[in-house]
Amino acid sequence: MIQTILAVSIAGIAGTLLRFAAGTWVSANWPRYFYAATLAVNIVGCLIIGVLYGLFLSRPEVPVEIRAGLIVGFVGGLTTFSSFSLDTLRLLESGQVPLALGYAGISVFGGLLATWAGLSLTRL
């Protein structure tokens, strides 16, 4: 159990740092599009989780430490629903209702599509 906790923790740090780097870069280069980093990491994270899930289904021998580390730790640290919610609220409060609705729709449906695509890639 301690090995699983360590794997999740270490991979979570990596995912979180990658999300932080994406947010920092977007804020520095495109401050008007602050939400783009959250959108990107959530869509990419959905693709990654789909691929990992498909791989782990076909390879049950992969140790639980690796599975949990990558899915719960890395992807969990990389993606974030709370930031998505805050970004959407900020857009709504600033009167950018169409953009907020588009962002929310793309995030949800894009995430579902990316997860499906990732899983499908493992079935080729």
From Swiss-Prot:
Na(+) is not transported, but it plays an essential structural role and its presence is essential for fluoride channel function. It is a multi-pass membrane protein. It catalyses: fluoride(in) = fluoride(out). Keywords: Cell inner membrane, Cell membrane, Ion channel, Ion transport, Membrane, Metal-binding, Sodium, Transmembrane, Transmembrane helix, Transport. It is found in: Cell inner membrane. Pfam families: CRCB. GO terms for molecular function: fluoride channel activity; metal ion binding. Its main location: membrane. PANTHER family: FLUORIDE EXPORT PROTEIN 1-RELATED. HAMAP family: FluC. This is Fluoride-specific ion channel FluC. It comes from Pseudomonas syringae pv. tomato (strain ATCC BAA-871 / DC3000). The lineage of its organism: Bacteria, Pseudomonadati, Pseudomonadota, Gammaproteobacteria, Pseudomonadales.
